[in-house]
Amino acid sequence: MRTLTIFFISLFSLPLVLNAQSVDEMLQKVSAAIEAGQNGQAVSYFRQTIALNIDRTEMYYWTNVDKNSEISSKLATELALAYKENRNYDKAYLFYKELLQKTPNNVDCLEACAEMQVCRGQEKDALRMYEKILQLEADNLAANIFLGNYYYLTAEQEKKKLETDYKKLSSPTKMQYARYRDGLSKL
């Protein structure tokens, strides 16, 4: 029984050891491809490494990748997409912000960053980003949908508050009714 237990423990721990070695090997391949100028191959290896261990891949990005190189934005995009797919919106937002520092008027990056802000519950920041997107590209569908929904829901909440406050009055005067109607017309 004891040998059987040892056998199973060693059998199940073997993939962890192999995984650690393969992540290091893949990261070495990424470095070699970057040094050789094979950016497409480097991104492919990087994507495979993300699938193996996203945390070590992120550490590699922060420690080994030159942030001024052209490939750094491609690698940051891969990490942002992976974190978004894993629903780690804070880290995805971090990498989209990293991309925005390089190209602050890139509509795609702004849109992805605003989407992450919505997922993180930061609607006010997302609102500002979507407004900036509309300044850059007036017919952006995602920005128009978000802003339309946001302003509509805000107006609905204000209308509900006005109606609730008006209904609290047992016998409203003409002046109170006029204020109520004026408040509704402003919405």
Predicted segments — roles?
Residues A51, E98-Q101, E131-Q135:
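Conserved structural position within tetratricopeptide repeats
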Residues I54, E70, P104, A138-D139:
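Short coil turns that delineate tetratricopeptide repeat
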Residues T57-E70, L153-L187:
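Short coil/linker segments at helix-helix boundaries
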Residues Y61-N64, K74, E78, A112, ...:
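Canonical tetratricopeptide repeat
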Residues L18-K74:
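N-terminal leader/linker segments that initiate helical-solenoid repeat arrays
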